[in-house]
Amino acid sequence: MIKDFFILDFSYEIKDNIPLIYIWSIDDEGNSCVVVERNFKPYFYVVYEGNGDEIIENIRKNCEVLLITKVKRKYLGNVVDALLVQTFTPTQIKRCREKISRINGIKSIFDADIRFTMRYSIDFDLRPFTWFKAEVSEVKLEGFRAKKVYILDKILSHYEGKIPELRAIGIDFQIYSKYGSLNPRKDPIVVLSLWSKEGSMQFSLDESMDDLKIIRKFVDYILNYDPDIIYVFDVDVFHWKYITERANSLGVKIDIGRKIGSEVSQGTYGHYSISGRLNVDLVGLLMNERLTGHIDLIEVANYLGISPKRDSLNWYEISRYWDDEKNRDLVKQYSLENAKSIYLLGNFLLSPYSELVKIIGLPLDKLSVASWGNRIEASLIRTAAKSEELIPIRMDNPNRSSKIKKTVIEPKIGIYSDVYVLDISSVYLSVIRKFNISPDTLVKGQCDDCYVSTISNYKFKKEPSGLYKTFLEELSNIQDTRKSKVIEELMSSFYDYIHWINSRWYSREIASAVDELSYEIGKLVIDLIKNSGFEVILANDFLVFVKGGSGDKLNELIFKINSLYDLNLKVRKIYRSLLILGNDRYAGLLEGDKIDIARIGKEDRDLCELVRNVKRKVVEEILISKDVKKAVKLVKSAVIKLRRGEFDIGELITWVHIEKDFSEYDKQLPFVVAARKAIQSGYLISKDSRIGYLIVKGHGSVHDRAEPFFFVKEKNRIDIEYYVDQLLRESLKVLTPLGVSEESLKKTNITDILDMFGASKKK
């Protein structure tokens, strides 16, 4: 029969030494299904010199291979002799690659680290969120939860079409732990909430239900509802790791995929994979957005207008709320609202990111945690494969390049009104396309008909179009028809990609050439803006901030520049007010009182909540009132309250995610000392845990006085002056560039005290 299938994801397994590829799909009747490919074999390429037959014989002696074929392929644009080496299973490629790399006559090995399912999707140009038409046979195979199972006979065509209605849910759960560092062996899940198109479902701890039953009911719900997409808001890849470890400790398997027996497991990019379903980490999507400083669910949902601002509960306080039966409904409602926000946020992001999935070819769950560099490279591999270009193996590259400093004016520190932000990232894209800069056009010898960089004299062939130019032109053509923000972001990120030293096609010459040529054009553009009556107050690699003149005049100038230099400059944002503190350190107020903060708060994750909040309020006050004195009063008021004991202990806790083994950390870091104290007292603190600590009074260095937060019950034990110093130090990072001295900020008089109580009078 001939049927059409909408692709969700790919996976594979080995049966009887035969790799089976599963194309998880929705068929043209709306059924969840799996299409099984039985005939595709893993392979890689070897570039050789000398006697090909002898080399083939040596490969066969060293490796268990299925087939070796002599082929012609391209490497960096040049046709080369190569061997296509097929193996029986994907795992044999790595073993074979290591053995044959030492054989005489073998120059290089290519395509050997491309995932098996990605190789298949590239060769047949199958991309998630697109359709394919195929000859298939419906079969009854055990081991699947999909409604239909098909054996693939032949792919007939592939095309883009309407996305079918996908079943999606948002998930949130809360954990009971009195000691902050969550231990899946002992800390139960007290409430688990789900939200879907049909509404809510919640399971919670009570006399009739322990968390073993919660987990079982959760598994049953997923299997019965059968979602195509599961949305999570998974900071530090925490949720799935915890729930799987908790389930294992209770003797339960989280077997919720469409392949029976395939448990939730960690995949290629660090995400947790669920067979046949897309497990999408929304934090991963948001953290890869430029200028997105929010990773808090409530803040980002409010910022995007998805759900209103609401109160947040600290995860380490859940046990306190749960112990008070009057507050249990508060925890339940909080978790339910989280699940709803996650579901709505997921659907909000689905539309733009589905476009990116089609272009890059990564399933949405993998794309959600892949960096922009990995996204670009996945797409570049597809472009290269179309022209039979060999794919280099990724490896560490010590041959670093240094970027040319492209900030062509010193930032004008201060507070500004009505600032236009111009996106100039098209300068780099234009340079790459205009000068055909690419690894396969780079000429290291003599060349009489090449483009040449301005400083280092790097040469690039004018014809044919290189890999990078071809890739960017393909994206540009797509963008012309779809006007997608995420495609635009993908193109803008290409500059960072060419400077990524661990990319497959990294070249110091290319990175330097793009820097040299784009610097010259960027300087001409900025000079033209300044000479047209606008004031340039900040310019970095991607953005130029200008003020003065009308919007119409600026649009006319942009049109002129784009025509003159073949660029695509555009106004990205308009700030009602803008605070500039240095290179790439700024904050802006948009319409609707939305605030962007860039780099000012980059180091804030190592601060306690109170200091972070005061620092943000200082920035907000400056942007809204443009009154530095009010911001100073805000800091002084916070200091007074801190010294008066008007705070919650939880506000002073500093939280750290432990990403490595303790042996890899400096022993004198406060969180390491606090964690060791907790371990010595019998608490489980390990890699991937979170530790919260407080600095207490006493003698010795600060790190020696770091205590796990659950050791500190009274406020009078806390070293308040440590936190006052931290508050002042962080506030001065914002206020000092605006003319506020440390001495004046520390000085507190009677007026400051009266201001705190609203008792001083303005005259």
Curated annotation (Swiss-Prot):
UniProt KW keywords: DNA replication, DNA-binding, DNA-directed DNA polymerase, Nucleotidyltransferase, Transferase
CDD domains: DNA_polB_B3_exo
SUPFAM superfamilies in UniProt: DNA/RNA polymerases (SSF56672), Ribonuclease H-like (SSF53098)
Gene Ontology BP, a term: DNA-templated DNA replication
Superkingdom, natural source: Archaea
SMART domains hit by this protein: POLBc
Catalytic activity, as annotated: DNA(n) + a 2'-deoxyribonucleoside 5'-triphosphate = DNA(n+1) + diphosphate
This protein's record includes keyword Nucleotidyltransferase: yes
Keyword check for Nucleotidyltransferase: yes
This enzyme's EC code(s): 2.7.7.7
GO molecular function: DNA binding; DNA-directed DNA polymerase activity; nucleotide binding
Listed InterPro entries: DNA-dir_DNA_pol_B, DNA-dir_DNA_pol_B_exonuc, DNA-dir_DNA_pol_B_multi_dom, DNA/RNA_pol_sf, DNA_pol_B_thumb, DNA_pol_palm_dom_sf, DNA_pol_type-B, RNaseH-like_sf
Database matches in Pfam families: DNA_pol_B, DNA_pol_B_exo1
Family: Belongs to the DNA polymerase type-B family.
Protein name: DNA polymerase 3
The organism of origin for this protein: Saccharolobus shibatae (strain ATCC 51178 / DSM 5389 / JCM 8931 / NBRC 15437 / B12)
